């Protein structure tokens, strides 16, 4: 069978299943593909195919992730599901699977469990903006009052972590029964909940703003001068767009950003009208000396990002087997933090009551860099020692 062309007619959204081990995340993922396959909107993925997820490497970290795709009438979805709890932690912190929204799976028979709480906290920390809840295994609960109780508990837990617990849609059903039935009819006792869930995901999780519509930002990878024309900074545009005549700021490695004007945009030595997110371009900058700009800085829309030295982050520390440290680290640890294109040394401050951090842990820390870098919430980074990756993190807040 010939490969189908990827149709870009529908808006694209990235989602994933999160929640406690054995609450039914993978079963639900399989059930979604089976139900949607009945109307030609997905390819069936069996439980085992999803559960035996292949290993991937992101920033030197091994993560097991299953990717499935499907669509509804309204949108196209890329859905990630991870077999193990550690995989979720790594996935969410490295941003390997960027989620525009998540389906939190909670077993109605057990209610919220430790990892339910941990995944909600992680979602809050790493900036997963929306959550929809699937209350699974409802076939195992005879008492409707018990379902109501779990519903309330989940809403309270979500509110604790600053999600709008009262507004979040909670769909009740049984992923296993839907998977076993797989007739896909909306009126079916079991398949109905899958349709309700997809409707809730369609309605409640907004279509994300496309990278090209965000304010311009390009990490500077290389700098050279062209005799008679000036200084060119090259890099891959991370977001937004840039054209000749745009005012931009050079941000990072200096205390104050510096304004300049783009007098030329080139791609593969050809002149471009406009460079957009994803393009590798060279920007000719007016009045900037070759020595006044360097790798590690960014070009950005004025006022859209500032240089900072102090921030909070959620980090995952690699295990020895992953090529990380063999020993714990303590307060005052001084590794390098690799942001976008450059390493900067920083000092780690552990939270109160935490004596040390072991390989394999995930922890919230405060970091003070020795030079300012263009930083914002949600920015991913690697922690390195002598060029070797020993951890991964995401900025959760700026501290000045």
Curated annotation (Swiss-Prot):
CDD domains: EF_Tu, EFTU_II, EFTU_III. The keyword Iron-sulfur does not apply. Residues 60-64 are annotated as: G2. GTP binds at residues 19-26, 81-85, 136-139. GO terms for cellular component: cytosol. Mg(2+) binds at residue 26. Residues 81-84 are annotated as: G3. It is found in: Cytoplasm. One of its GO terms (molecular function) is translation elongation factor activity. Residues 10-209 form the tr-type G domain. InterPro entries: EF-Tu_GTP-bd (IPR041709), EF-Tu_GTPase (IPR050055), EFTu-like_2 (IPR004161), EFTU_2 (IPR033720), G_TR_CS (IPR031157), P-loop_NTPase (IPR027417), Small_GTP-bd (IPR005225), T_Tr_GTP-bd_dom (IPR000795). Keywords: Cytoplasm, Elongation factor, GTP-binding, Hydrolase, Magnesium, Metal-binding, Nucleotide-binding, Protein biosynthesis. Belongs to the TRAFAC class translation factor GTPase superfamily. Classic translation factor GTPase family. EF-Tu/EF-1A subfamily. Monomer. This is Elongation factor Tu 1. The gene is tuf1.
């Amino acid at each position: 069978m010939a490969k189908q062309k990827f149709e870009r007619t529908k808006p694209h959204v990235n989602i994933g299943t999160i929640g406690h081990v054995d609450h039914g995340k993978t079963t639900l993922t399989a059930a979604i593909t089976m139900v949607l396959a009945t109307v030609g909107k997905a390819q069936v993925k069996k439980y085992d195919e999803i559960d035996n997820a292949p290993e991937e490497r992101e920033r030197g970290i091994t993560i097991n992730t299953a990717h499935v795709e499907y669509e509804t009438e309204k949108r196209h979805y890329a859905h990630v599901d991870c077999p193990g709890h550690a995989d979720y932690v790594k996935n969410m912190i490295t941003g390997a699977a960027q989620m525009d929204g998540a389906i939190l799976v909670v077993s109605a028979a057990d209610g919220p469990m430790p990892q339910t709480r941990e995944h909600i906290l992680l979602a809050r920390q790493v900036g997963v903006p929306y959550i929809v809840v699937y209350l699974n295994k409802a076939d195992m609960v005879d008492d409707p009052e018990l379902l109501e109780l779990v519903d309330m508990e989940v809403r309270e837990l979500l509110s604790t972590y600053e999600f709008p617990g009262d507004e979040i849609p909670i769909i009740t059903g049984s992923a296993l029964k839907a998977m076993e039935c797989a007739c896909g009819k909306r009126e079916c006792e079991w398949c109905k909940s899958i349709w309700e869930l997809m409707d809730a995901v369609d309605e409640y999780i907004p279509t994300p703003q496309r990278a090209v519509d965000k304010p311009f930002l390009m990490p500077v990878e290389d700098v050279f001068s062209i005799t008679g024309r000036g200084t060119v900074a090259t890099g891959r545009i991370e977001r937004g767009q840039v054209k000749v005549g745009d005012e931009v700021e050079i941000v990072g490695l200096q205390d104050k950003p510096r304004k300049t004007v783009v007098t030329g945009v080139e791609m593969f030595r050809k002149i471009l009208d406009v460079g957009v997110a994803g393009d590798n371009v060279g920007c000719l900058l007016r009045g900037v000396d070759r020595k006044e700009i360097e790798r590690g800085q960014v070009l950005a829309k004025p006022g859209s990002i500032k240089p900072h030295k102090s921030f909070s982050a959620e980090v995952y520390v690699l295990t020895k087997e992953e090529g990380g440290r063999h020993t714990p680290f303590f307060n005052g640890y001084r590794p390098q933090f690799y942001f976008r294109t450059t390493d900067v040394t920083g000092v780690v401050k552990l939270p109160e009551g935490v004596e040390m951090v072991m390989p394999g842990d995930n922890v919230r820390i405060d970091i003070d860099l020795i030079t300012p870098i263009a930083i914002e919430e949600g920015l991913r980074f690697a922690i390195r020692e002598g060029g070797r990756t020993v951890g991964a993190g995401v900025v959760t807040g700026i501290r000045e």
